[in-house]
Amino acid sequence: MPSIYVNIFLAFIFALLGMLIYRSHLMSSLLCLEGMMLSLFILITLTALNMHFTLSFMFPIVLLVFAACEAAIGLALLVMVSNTYGMDYVQNLNLLQC
């Protein structure tokens, strides 16, 4: 396995560990999710370029679209929670309160 794949995989693991460690604040969780999506995007792009399979070139773009949607929804949720409660703790996101 080339070292670039190991580095990208380690970046994904570190972002996942950051998500598990800093899960109390919503902003930290969103940044870790973006790091995970970025490492997945690079990994899928490198794999598609190395495989020379024409149909696999659309997978990184689809992942990028989903990452942009996730970021937009996450930032909207962050603005809503910070305006309502004045802080960005994840514990304020109780979905049972409606």
From Swiss-Prot:
Segments traversing the membrane:
1-21, 29-49, 61-81
Single GO MF annotation: NADH dehydrogenase (ubiquinone) activity
The record's Gene Ontology cellular component field reads:
mitochondrial inner membrane; respiratory chain complex I
Answer whether the UniProt record assigns the keyword Transmembrane to this protein: yes
Q: Which Pfam families would you find in this protein's record?
A: Oxidored_q2
Q: Which reaction does it catalyse?
A: a ubiquinone + NADH + 5 H(+)(in) = a ubiquinol + NAD(+) + 4 H(+)(out)
Q: List the disulfide bonds.
A: none
Give the record's keywords alphabetically: Electron transport, Membrane, Mitochondrion, Mitochondrion inner membrane, NAD, Respiratory chain, Translocase, Transmembrane, Transmembrane helix, Transport, Ubiquinone
Q: Which domain of life is it from?
A: Eukaryota
Q: Which InterPro entries match?
A: NADH_UbQ_OxRdtase_chain4L/K, NUOK/Mnh_C1-like
Provide the E.C. number(s) assigned to this enzyme. Answer: 7.1.1.2
Which compartments does it reside in? Mitochondrion inner membrane
Q: What class of enzyme is it?
A: translocase
GO BP terms: namely: ATP synthesis coupled electron transport
Q: What's its membrane topology?
A: Multi-pass membrane protein
Q: How does it assemble?
A: Core subunit of respiratory chain NADH dehydrogenase (Complex I) which is composed of 45 different subunits.
Family to which the UniProt record says this protein belongs: Belongs to the complex I subunit 4L family.
Q: What is known about what this protein does?
A: Core subunit of the mitochondrial membrane respiratory chain NADH dehydrogenase (Complex I) which catalyzes electron transfer from NADH through the respiratory chain, using ubiquinone as an electron acceptor. Part of the enzyme membrane arm which is embedded in the lipid bilayer and involved in proton translocation.
Q: Please state what the protein is called.
A: NADH-ubiquinone oxidoreductase chain 4L
Q: Which organism is it from?
A: Lepus europaeus
